[in-house]
Curated annotation (Swiss-Prot):
Keyword Secreted among record annotations: yes
Major subcellular location class: secreted
Upper classification of the organism: Bacteria, Pseudomonadati, Pseudomonadota, Gammaproteobacteria, Alteromonadales
GO CC list: extracellular region
Gene from which the chain derives: gbpA
UniProt protein name: GlcNAc-binding protein A
Coiled coil start-end: none
C-alpha cells in the first residue's frame, strides 16, 4: 500500500477583500462524485432513505473519528437519528459506483463552505461484514488520503485527487470526513463503491440504470423496463413481468424476478449486483442494470402498470326464505362478508313499507352474523335491504324478500329426522321430533354438514347438536 498521501487543496484561494463566514454559520456539504450514500438518496439512485433525501448536506456529527465521533453502527448517519436509514447495511441495500484502484477524484459540493480543518478518507477492510452496520471494525482506521484545509474557507466545489489502495476488490465503502475548523463537528459521507478485479479496463459492462425496491406490488400488477439509446426508446429491448401474488409483489422480491427476466431475455443487458470477480447476478432488493460494451444503450428506466384494485364486495348468506313467529316474537338472522372495512346495515320493511327492524355492524374484510329483531311481527311478506358503506367507494345495496309465518303455519317438512339423511341437500326441510320444530339445510358450503350424523356423532343434529347452527336454519 502506498504511503499516506498529503495533498494540497486544489484551487483553494480566497479572493481579495472576501470575508470569512460567521462563526455561527451552518456548514453543510456532501460528496457528489462518486455519489455518496446520502447524495444518491437525493438523486433517486437510493430509495427508502427517509429525511436525508431532502438534506444530504446535513449528515453532521461530533468530530474525532475514529478515536471518538459517531458510535459504531451509527457512522453512516453521523449518529443523527433523523438520518438513521443511512445505517442500514446489506450487500444489496445501496447503489454502488464502479471505482478503480490508484488515483481517483473525490468532489465535494458545499451549500455553506465553512472554514475547514481537514478532509479524511477511510476505506473498509477486505472481507468486512457487509451485513452489519458500519463500525470501526469495518474500516482500516488509517486514512488513505488526508487533505489539509488550512483553516480557511474552501470554494463551493472542491475536488481531491487521492490514491486508492490496490488491495481491495468487490463491494467496499469509503468514509469521507469533512472536519470543519470553527465548530466541534464533522460531516460524514459513506460512499458505496465496487472494485473490479484489477484496474477498470475499457470494454466493461456499464451501469445505466437501477431496479429500486421502491414499493410493494399486488397480483396483476406489471413492472417493466424502458431502454433508451441515443435515438430514443428501444421498445424491442423491453422486459416485463406480471406479479402473480403478494409474495412475488413484496418490494424485496420483485426486483430479483425482474433482474432474472432481463438476464434471460436481453443479451445486451445484465441486471444484478457485481461481485468481487465482476460477475453480475440478481439479488433480492436493489439491482443495477448494466449495458454490454459497444451496445449503444444509454439508459434504462423501470415503470409500473398498476392493476385496478378489486371493487368493494358484499356477500349475504344463510338467509332463509321464511322465519317463524314464536310467542309473538321473530328474528331474521343471516351472515355477511366484505372484502374491505365497511359498516353493514340491514333494514326490514313490511309489505306496505313500514319499518320493521334494523341492525348494523362494522365488518372489516371478514364475515359476521347479524340478527335482526322484528318489530311487531305479523305473518306475511317482508322486504330486507342490506347496505354496506365502505370508507372509500360507493355504497353497496342488496335486496331480499322473505316471509314470516306463524308457528301453526310453519312449513311442511320433507323428512322426519333422521329419515332419508343421505338425500339431504341445501334447502331440505326436516321435522325434529325432539323439539317439534322444522329446520332447513343451509346452502353451500354448509350443506355438507347436514348429512354428517350417526347415533354416536350428533354434533350437527338439527336443534340438538353442539354445532347444529353450522348446518341448519330453524324455520
Amino acid at each position: 500500500m502506498p504511503k499516506l498521501t498529503q495533498l494540497s487543496l486544489v484551487t483553494l484561494a480566497l479572493t481579495a477583500g472576501s470575508t470569512l463566514v460567521s462563526q455561527t454559520a451552518s456548514a453543510h456539504g456532501y460528496v457528489v462524485s462518486p455519489e455518496s450514500r446520502s447524495y444518491a438518496c437525493k438523486t433517486g439512485s437510493n430509495v427508502n432513505c427517509g429525511a436525508v433525501q431532502w438534506e444530504p448536506q446535513s449528515v453532521e456529527g461530533a468530530s474525532g473519528f475514529p478515536e471518538s465521533g459517531p458510535a459504531d453502527g451509527k457512522i453512516a448517519s453521523a449518529a443523527n437519528g433523523a438520518f438513521s436509514p443511512l445505517d442500514e447495511q446489506s450487500p444489496s441495500r445501496w447503489s454502488k459506483r464502479d471505482i478503480k484502484s490508484g488515483w481517483n477524484d473525490f468532489s465535494w459540493q458545499f451549500t455553506a463552505n465553512h472554514v475547514t480543518r481537514n478532509w479524511r478518507y477511510y476505506l473498509t477492510r477486505q472481507g468486512w461484514d457487509q451485513n452489519q452496520p458500519l463500525s470501526r471494525a469495518s474500516f482500516d482506521l488509517a486514512p488513505f488520503c488526508v487533505i489539509d484545509g488550512g483553516m480557511v474557507q474552501p470554494p463551493k466545489l472542491v475536488t481531491h485527487n487521492c490514491y486508492v489502495p490496490e488491495d481491495r476488490s468487490g463491494y467496499q465503502v469509503i468514509l469521507a470526513v469533512w472536519e470543519v475548523g470553527d465548530t466541534t463537528n464533522s460531516f460524514y459521507n459513506a460512499i458505496d463503491v465496487n472494485f473490479s478485479s484489477g484496474a477498470v479496463v475499457p470494454g466493461e459492462w456499464t451501469d445505466i440504470g437501477d431496479i429500486n425496491p421502491s414499493l410493494d406490488l399486488k397480483a396483476g400488477d406489471k413492472v417493466m423496463t424502458r431502454v433508451f439509446d441515443a435515438n430514443g426508446e428501444q421498445s424491442a429491448k423491453q422486459t416485463q413481468i406480471t406479479i402473480a401474488d403478494a409474495t412475488q409483489g413484496a418490494k424485496q422480491n420483485w426486483p430479483f424476478l425482474l433482474a432474472s427476466a432481463i438476464n434471460a431475455q436481453q443479451p445486451q443487458l445484465k441486471a444484478g449486483q457485481k461481485n468481487a470477480a465482476g460477475v453480475i447476478s440478481p439479488v433480492y432488493g436493489k439491482n443495477e442494470i448494466f449495458a454490454a460494451p459497444k451496445s449503444g444503450l444509454e439508459r434504462v428506466e423501470v415503470s409500473f402498470d398498476i392493476a385496478p384494485a378489486p371493487g368493494n364486495q358484499l356477500n349475504v348468506t344463510s338467509l332463509a326464505d321464511d322465519y317463524t313467529i314464536v310467542d309473538g316474537a321473530a328474528q331474521v338472522s343471516f351472515d355477511v362478508s366484505t372484502n374491505a372495512d365497511m359498516q353493514v346495515s340491514a333494514y326490514l320493511f313490511s309489505h306496505d313499507g313500514t319499518a320493521a327492524g334494523y341492525v348494523t355492524q362494522a365488518v372489516n374484510n371478514t364475515s359476521a352474523s347479524l340478527v335482526l329483531d322484528v318489530v311487531a311481527p305479523k305473518a306475511g311478506h317482508y322486504h330486507l335491504q342490506v347496505k354496506a358503506e365502505p370508507k372509500q367507494g360507493e355504497v353497496i345495496q342488496q335486496n331480499f324478500d322473505l316471509f314470516l309465518k306463524d308457528q301453526a303455519t310453519a312449513p311442511d317438512a320433507d323428512f322426519i329426522f333422521p329419515e332419508g339423511i343421505k338425500s339431504y341437500v341445501a334447502g331440505t326441510k326436516v321435522l325434529q321430533p325432539k323439539t317439534g320444530k322444522v329446520y332447513q339445510c343451509k346452502p353451500w358450503p354448509y350443506n355438507g354438514y347436514c348429512v354428517q350424523w350417526s347415533p354416536t356423532a350428533t354434533g350437527f343434529e338439527p336443534g340438538i347438536g353442539n354445532s347444529w347452527t353450522m348446518a341448519w336454519t330453524e324455520l
